[in-house]
Amino acid sequence: MKPNIHPEYRTVVFHDTSVDEYFKIGSTIKTDREIELDGVTYPYVTIDVSSKSHPFYTGKLRTVASEGNVARFTQRFGRFVSTKKGA
């Protein structure tokens, strides 16, 4: 491999702010922020969603009631369609 073309691979702390969890993961992400954990200073990155907070991984899925095409049509355009027969 060519020297000096690969990014620096290092341990980085990712902070999931929605559940206040910290993850130490190897990464090449660049950041100017740092945090000290366990007496060691690491690069620090905040994230909004991780496997600890995403509904798919936590099992707290939101269920969306599925409607048929006719029900959706009636909901959207029902006010324009006359309900009187033989008019």
From Swiss-Prot:
A GO term from the CC aspect: cytoplasm
Gene that specifies this protein: ykgM
Matching HAMAP family: Ribosomal_bL31_2 (MF_00502)
Chain segments annotated as transmembrane: none
Knocked-out gene: effects: Grows poorly in the absence of zinc.
Species whose genome carries this gene: Escherichia coli (strain K12)
Signal peptide range: none
Keyword Transport found: no
PROSITE patterns: RIBOSOMAL_L31
Biological process, per Gene Ontology: cellular response to zinc ion starvation; cytoplasmic translation; translation
Pfam families according to UniProt: Ribosomal_L31
Sorted UniProt keywords: Ribonucleoprotein, Ribosomal protein
The keyword Ribonucleoprotein belongs to this UniProt entry's keyword annotation: yes
The protein's name: Large ribosomal subunit protein bL31B
